[in-house]
């Protein structure tokens, strides 16, 4: 059996991969996500809340699953990169010649695959680490895609809620314009107003009616966009929300939020993993100076046993130098891309924080001062009109001012929520707890 020990060693070496440290943990994370994705998907209720839409989108969004499978594909490249070449078994049989047994006429051989030399283990380890960093980057991009889906669902839900407010405000405006038209018609009949006043009132009501119909038509477009995120048919019924989602507070100062941007951004983290992978690629290019080798072992019956080997001399000095410089340039490009991404993220954060704080200030002004004042003026005009001391035009003007203030407040709240979603997405923040949101936490939100 000892004559086959070398052959057995070659076979075992060919079957083993050099697994980098951290691969098992990355695979465990991917397996945990797979169990989440394969769980039974929740059903969307007839009148879904924002939380219902978020839960359904996690299971149904195809883009999120595509990112997951890209992550798994990157993980499966690790053993491919970190494995030695295949072994080749050869067989030959000698015909004719002196009297020999069948075994002595037989030659068995094992060698590395032709055209694929055996790299030293350090090369395989470096290649495995490079593939692991690429897999980690893919995993972080899945994380970014998860928060991207959450952001798109939140944004579209806010758009739907704002659309519901716009439809309600437009309906009340139509009622007011109908009242104004009725008063204008009465005044024309009484001879106290020209016909032009009635025509103007009718035109205003017709334009408002057309705008109302346009708003109802836009509902189908917004619903189709949300249905796409939820993995439903584009024309599946989706009612408008009954109210704007409650405002969520952003804890911490602006300086703290800006600091978190660079620390928790999944895109920056993915770029950092790509930089680490390029560093391993540079090490792999330098390792081309280390010769690869080949081994062979042959047994000719009971007559002879031979062990052979070969070595590849790294004489292509300029080619190796070029590969090293290419890897170094690629590393510098990845570092520059990461630095620019950090700068762009910081700039976008300054903008989003400005939008958020400015909308907060304006919303507070409308909520505490302008809207109550406009509603008080509308109630006063209504009381004056009921007492016969005011006109319908005055009532309509006062009430429409209150409706405009109500719509402006809803728009400010929607803009603030979108700015908060952008901050939340880039930093993986749970604004209620100010910590990274885990996958399980997000499912239950």
Which sequence ranges carry the predicted segments?
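Acidic, low-complexity, intrinsically disordered peripheral segments
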Residues: 17-21, 408-445
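Bacterial Sec-pathway N-terminal export signals of envelope proteins
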Residues: 16-86, 234, 240-276, 339-342, ...
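A glycine-/polar-enriched beta->alpha junction
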Residues: 56-66, 72-87, 100-101, 112-130, ...
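Sec-dependent bacterial lipoprotein signal peptides
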Residues: 1-14
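Periplasmic alpha-helical coiled-coil/stalk elements that build and connect Gram-negative outer-membrane
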Residues: 18, 124, 140-260, 352-355, ...
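A short glycine-centered flexible hinge/capping loop motif at secondary-structure junctions
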Residues: 188-192, 385-389, 426-428
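Amphipathic alpha-helical coiled-coil segments and their boundaries
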Residues: 53, 60, 67, 117, ...
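Small/polar, glycine/serine/threonine/aspartate-rich low-complexity segments that form flexible
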Residues: 40-45, 90-123, 127, 240-251, ...
């Amino acid at each position: 059996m000892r004559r086959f020990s070398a052959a057995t060693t070659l076979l075992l070496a060919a079957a083993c991969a050099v697994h980098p440290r951290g691969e098992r943990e990355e695979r465990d994370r991917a397996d945990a996500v797979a169990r989440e994705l394969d769980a039974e998907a929740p059903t969307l209720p007839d009148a879904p809340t924002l939380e219902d839409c978020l839960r359904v989108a996690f299971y149904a969004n195809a883009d999120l699953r595509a990112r997951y499978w890209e992550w798994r594909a990157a993980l499966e490249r690790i053993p491919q990169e970190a494995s030695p070449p295949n072994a080749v078994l050869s067989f030959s049989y000698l015909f004719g010649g002196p009297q020999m047994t069948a075994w002595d006429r037989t030659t068995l051989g094992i060698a590395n695959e032709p055209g694929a030399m055996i790299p030293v283990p350090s090369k395989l380890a470096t290649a495995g680490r490079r593939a692991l960093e690429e897999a980690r980057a893919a995993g972080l991009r899945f994380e970014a895609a998860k928060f991207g889906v959450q952001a798109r669902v939140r944004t579209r839900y806010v758009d739907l809620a704002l659309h519901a407010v716009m439809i309600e405000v437009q309906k009340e405006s139509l009622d007011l314009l109908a009242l104004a038209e009725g008063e204008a018609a009465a005044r024309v009949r009484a001879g106290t107003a020209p016909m032009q006043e009635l025509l103007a009132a009718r035109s205003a009501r017709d334009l408002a009616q057309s705008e109302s119909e346009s708003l109802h038509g836009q509902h189908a477009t917004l619903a189709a966009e949300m249905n796409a995120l939820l993995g439903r048919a584009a024309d599946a019924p989706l009612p408008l929300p009954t109210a704007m989602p409650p405002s969520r507070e952003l804890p911490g100062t602006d300086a703290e939020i800006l600091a978190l941007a660079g620390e928790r951004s999944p895109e920056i983290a993915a770029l950092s993993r790509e930089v680490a992978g390029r560093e391993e690629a540079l090490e792999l290019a330098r390792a081309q100076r280390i010769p690869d080798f080949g081994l062979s072992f042959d047994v000719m019956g009971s007559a002879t046993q031979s062990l052979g080997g070969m070595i590849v001399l790294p004489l292509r000095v300029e080619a190796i130098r070029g590969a090293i410089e290419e890897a170094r340039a690629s590393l510098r490009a990845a570092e520059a891309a990461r630095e620019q991404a950090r700068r762009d993220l910081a700039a976008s954060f300054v903008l989003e924080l400005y939008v958020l704080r400015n909308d907060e200030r304006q919303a507070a002004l409308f909520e505490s001062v302008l809207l109550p004042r406009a509603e008080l003026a509308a109630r006063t005009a209504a009381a004056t009109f009921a007492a016969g001391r005011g006109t319908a035009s005055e009532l309509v003007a006062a009430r429409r001012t209150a409706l405009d203030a109500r719509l402006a407040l809803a728009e400010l709240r929607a803009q603030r929520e979108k700015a908060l979603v952008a901050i939340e997405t880039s930093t993986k923040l749970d604004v209620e707890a100010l910590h990274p949101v885990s996958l399980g936490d997000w499912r239950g939100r």
